A protein has these predicted regions:
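Glycine-rich phosphate/nucleotide-binding loop
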Residues: 1-82, 86-94
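Glycine-rich phosphate/pyrophosphate-binding loop and the adjoining helix
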Residues: 77, 82, 86-118
Length: 118
């Protein structure tokens, strides 16, 4: 389905919907136009984590998911499916989680694990 909403309400709705897949840190985003498309993490980067010295704990799954969406949109469905499957395998196995705290995996460890699943 397609919803057309003002930015504020779209933001609220996507935040709530993202909770079904693990939170806003796991959601990719697609902005599709007639001629152009842009893919990104649902809420962009994590500058507050950088300011607090916790940048290595930023969760990269939203950017990885956006990358899979870009692959799909660009006609690389097989590669997109493999990337989506790697994300799902990582989530299902719960081997590595990025918590934003020192007790979780770093973004690099998580990304390496995703790459090993490809």
């Amino acid at each position: 389905e397609v919803f057309i909403l003002p930015n504020l309400y779209g933001d609220i709705l996507t935040d709530e919907a993202a909770e079904f897949q693990g939170g806003v840190g796991t959601a990719g985003s697609a902005n599709l136009g007639k001629r152009y498309a842009m893919f990104e993490a649902i809420h962009g980067s994590a500058p507050r984590m950088v300011e607090e010295g916790r940048e290595i704990y930023a969760d990269p799954s939203s950017v990885i998911r956006a990358g899979a969406m870009l692959l799909s949109h660009s006609g690389y469905q097989e590669q997109a499916d493999r990337l989506f499957a790697a994300l799902e395998a990582c989530a299902a196995e719960k081997k590595l989680t990025v918590t934003g705290r020192p007790d979780g995996a770093t973004g690099a460890q998580y990304t390496d694990y995703i790459l090993s699943k490809l």
